[in-house]
Amino acid sequence: MENNNSGEHKTNDDRLTDIFSSVGRQYRLTDVTAQFVAFRDLKIRWQRSYKMADFMVSDYLDDAPDGILWDFADTIIAKIFAENDSDYSNSVIEWISSDGFRARKQPIYLRRSKNLTRSPVGREKNLLDSYGRLVDDGLVEEDPGLCISWMKSATARKIGHCSVVMDVVALSG
């Protein structure tokens, strides 16, 4: 919880609602709520009806500075109203793609990813050996923060999973 200037204690959800409400007013939204939700992936869900909107924002953003949340809210709401076809602001992209973000959020992502062994060592193959060959051949750059893992259970439709933001690659065996 953080303390604002009026002496009130505000939760992160209150802070998020304040930001999304302020941006929403620019689009004539009068009833806006927003909350952080523990999704596995970095994402946002919303429901909108006439002048009401409810936003569920991945809690990976719960420690974002207000400026990042303002830019994020502005992009999302503008896209909902089809007034903005642009990508997220440079500040949002830089914050989410920073080493600090990955260091703080990757362990949370891994805990939420129930189908990962969290080990590159499989029954017959060590994925780090394969990754090392790719690096040696110059096909990828070495990334010390990359997490390579096997998936616990394989499905016929899914050969793997990748999260570019969280720097995780998982393969089914």
What is each of the regions a protein language model found here?
Residues 1-173:
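Active-site-proximal or metal-binding-adjacent scaffold patches in catalytic folds
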